[in-house]
Amino acid sequence: MTADLFWNIIEDYNRQTWIYQAALMGALVFGFILSLKKRAQWFLKITLGVANIFIGTVFFLYYGTEPIQHYFAAPLFLAIGALFILEGIRYSDDEFGPLSPLQWSLLALVTLYPLVSFLLGNTFPRMVVYIMPCPIVSFSIVLYSGYKRKNIVLLVLLTLWGLTGIKSFFFNALEDIILLMCGIYCARCVVSEIGKWKRAGIKES
């Protein structure tokens, strides 16, 4: 995929779906506030699930033009979304927060996505906004890391997309350096969870 085609897809997607994006972003903010207040902490996971499924079906299956979007990216986001919804339903009592200084810092960086895209010379609709693949995965990584319970399969899937932030240097989308940072952090979370499993196994033996 060329950089020009990449930005053309973004432009069409933003122009035609902005109202749905606004609704999803409002739900994410609401879910985050609920979680901070220790109320209905499952709602944020469900909303992240819906947002990832929206990206998989709408951004990649409907607006996508390349095989890699249809056969890799779309299934990946659909799987991430399904796991988030399953987590929200099955572990509805899972506790959120408090976030660490590092998590707050990463969250602050993710909220800067549109501003960074604008400062790099992009304007709406040809710019990166929140309800897009890379910002959504970045939000998903940071917010999911705030929960006590972690699904390592979900973390691995999030890491897979997070590390694609390296493409920021090839598609002139330098704002996706934020995604790369979140991907590296998520990889660290995976290693941490594996370490917990090993320690638990040693204690049991």
What are the residue ranges of the model-derived segments?
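Membrane-interface capping segments at transmembrane-helix boundaries
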Residues: 89-94, 190-204
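Membrane-interfacial loop-to-transmembrane alpha-helix junctions, especially the N-terminal start
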Residues: 39-49, 97-106, 146-157
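Membrane-helix boundary connector in multi-pass membrane proteins
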Residues: 62-66, 144-156, 161-176
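N-terminal topogenic module of multi-pass integral membrane proteins
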Residues: 1-68
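Loop-to-transmembrane alpha-helix initiation sites
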Residues: 69-74, 170-183
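Aromatic-anchored segments of alpha-helical transmembrane domains
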Residues: 50-58, 108-118, 158-170
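Alpha-helical transmembrane segments and their membrane-interface exit regions
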Residues: 50-55, 76-84, 135-143, 162-164, ...
